Curated annotation (Swiss-Prot):
Domain of life assignment: Bacteria
GO MF terms, alphabetically ordered: nicotianamine synthase activity
Alphabetic keyword roster: S-adenosyl-L-methionine, Transferase
Organism of provenance: Pseudomonas aeruginosa (strain UCBPP-PA14)
Disruption phenotype: Cells lacking this gene are unable to synthesize pseudopaline and are impaired in their ability to import nickel in a minimal media, supplemented or not with nickel. Under more stringent conditions where a chelator such as EDTA is added to a minimal succinate (MS) medium, a condition that presumably mimics the chelating environment prevailing within a host or in airway mucus secretion (AMS), the deletion mutant strain is unable to import zinc, therefore reconciling the regulation of this operon by zinc with its function as a zinc importer operating in metal scarce conditions.
Similarity section: Belongs to the methyltransferase superfamily. CntL family.
Coiled coil: none
E.C. numbers: 2.5.1.-
Name of the protein: L-histidine 2-aminobutanoyltransferase
Function: Catalyzes the nucleophilic attack of one alpha-aminobutanoate moiety from SAM onto L-histidine to produce the intermediate (2S)-2-amino-4-{[(1S)-1-carboxy-2-(1H-imidazol-4-yl)ethyl]amino}butanoate. Functions in the biosynthesis of the metallophore pseudopaline, which is involved in the acquisition of nickel and zinc, and thus enables bacterial growth inside the host, where metal access is limited. Therefore, this enzyme probably contributes to Pseudomonas virulence. Cannot use D-histidine in place of L-histidine as substrate.
GO biological process: nicotianamine biosynthetic process
Reactions that this protein is recorded to catalyse: L-histidine + S-adenosyl-L-methionine = (2S)-2-amino-4-{[(1S)-1-carboxy-2-(1H-imidazol-4-yl)ethyl]amino}butanoate + S-methyl-5'-thioadenosine + H(+)
């Protein structure tokens, strides 16, 4: 135990618990609630000042960095599984979902204002997942039109059904095709890349091929302790892009607003 920090030990426990609960939940639905609490605990740690300070102080510790990578992979997998489970409840209580979406608008207001997203926007959302709350908020509360992309067909099925239950079919479409193969990409005013998208450079390259000259990219990412729940973006991945608005910081992730360099 000597030399192990409290944060390191806490993260070790969380990784083990999240991995086990993700497996158990597939056999016993009651485990999903416990899994949700563990993910909430991880989210809480990321937002705590003391955890951030300890992460910064130990940022050169190879054991902590390796653990962070393992924990992120476990957390991302768990969240994807949990979202699919939660979708089943959402489909039975569409009214509750509507009220929840209304309350979320302020949480993404900074991104909307910085990127200029309004009712005339056409947003391509890459990595939308089974429960695409940001996309649903944009369609329901802002009036934007969206195309949600995900490589997980099961997740798309859930998301499509939730959009139908919310009466948003006219404003939301869904696809598993790459951005470069979608006609929507050429007319999109904005591209939103989820923080859980790992291959950000590949997605940026595809978007660059087809995007309008005046379109903007909202790139959600996590660095430092926020990388425990989100994939980072490296400076080299931003070659050919320029930041066109101040970085938007959220408790769990940050957002860069990008446009083509030299346009």
């Amino acid at each position: 135990m000597q030399g192990r920090t409290p944060l390191l030990e806490t993260l070790r426990e969380l990784e083990c618990e999240i991995r086990l609960l993700t497996v158990y939940a597939r056999e016993c639905c009651g485990c999903y609630e416990i899994l949700r609490r563990k993910l909430d605990r991880l989210s809480g740690l990321i937002g705590e000042d003391c955890s951030r300070a300890q992460w910064q102080a130990d940022s050169d510790d190879p054991a902590l960095q390796a653990l962070g990578l393992r924990l992120r992979d476990a957390a991302v997998q768990a969240l994807c599984e949990l979202e699919k489970h939660l979708c089943q409840g959402v489909l039975h209580e569409p009214g509750e979902m509507g009220r929840y979406l209304g309350s979320l608008l302020e949480s993404i207001r900074g991104e909307l204002d910085s990127a200029g997203i309004d009712a005339d926007a056409r947003v391509l959302f890459v990595g939308s997942g089974a429960l695409p709350t940001s996309a649903l908020v944009l369609a329901r509360e802002v009036g934007a039109h969206l195309c949600c992309l995900d490589i997980d067909e099961e997740a798309l099925g859930y998301a499509r059904e939730i959009a139908r239950c919310q009466g948003l079919e006219a404003r939301m479409q869904f696809s598993s095709l790459p951005p470069a193969e979608l006609a929507f990409s050429r007319d999109a005013t904005h591209f939103l890349i989820a923080s859980l998208v790992q291959q950000k450079s590949a997605v940026l390259a595809q978007i660059r091929q087809v995007m309008r000259a005046d379109a903007k990219v909202l790139l959600r990412h996590g660095s430092g302790i926020k990388g425990l729940f989100n994939y980072p973006v490296e400076p080299a991945e931003l070659e050919g892009w320029q930041v066109c608005a101040e970085r938007v910081s959220q408790p769990l992730y940050d957002t860069l607003i990008l446009e083509k360099a030299g346009r």
